[in-house]
Amino acid sequence: MVDEAKLHQFVGQMLSDLGGAASVALVRIGDALGLYKTLHERGPATVDELAAAAGVNQRYLREWLSHQAASNYIAYDPATQKFTLPPEQAMVFAIEDSPVYMPGAFSCMASILDNQPKVEPAFKTGAGVAWGDQASCLFCAVARFFRPGYHNNLVANWLPALDGVVAKLEKGAKVADVGCGHGVSTVIMA
């Protein structure tokens, strides 16, 4: 017998997951077109004002802004009909040196979808998918996602927390950077 309450709860979870999945593409579009940065730099804007500032089509922008506001990624003031990127969201979407800058994470998620045709056969064979065989956008996405954390923490916090590692690196060491995002961490350490 089906428990209706559990079924509705699970369907709600699935709808939430689907909403999150839709956000992947829309965040990537906003990032690629500079919409978050334009809204952050410009401040509160109507659809028409932001469309002009960003050089995008007003109709598509309205749909994008509506989704972003419904997802609480941006704020909307119905009295002024203006959209705003609050400071907390700006740290996540517009300020590249922020320790919580996350557009790269959304590209990582897109890579997971792109990798499905490679991963699916691995379920049968058990052979796995080599790092170098991943979707090409994954490597840039990993670099972009991890760079803020490396920039804000690697030298200042993470390396000093490892006993003796800083001294070894200062003497000169060979480092293998595998799967860490185009050598971003190695460049920061240098």
Regions found by a protein language model. Give the residues of each.
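Conserved beta-strand/loop positions that form the S-adenosyl-L-methionine
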Residues: 178
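Conserved SAM-binding loop of SAM-dependent methyltransferases across substrates and taxa
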Residues: 182-190
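Conserved Class I S-adenosyl-L-methionine-dependent methyltransferase catalytic core
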Residues: 2-5, 16-38, 53, 62-173
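Intrinsically disordered, low-complexity terminal regions of plant proteins
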Residues: 7-10
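A short acidic, leucine-rich amphipathic alpha-helix
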Residues: 47-52
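Short helix-to-turn junction characteristic of helix-turn-helix DNA-binding domains
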Residues: 39-43
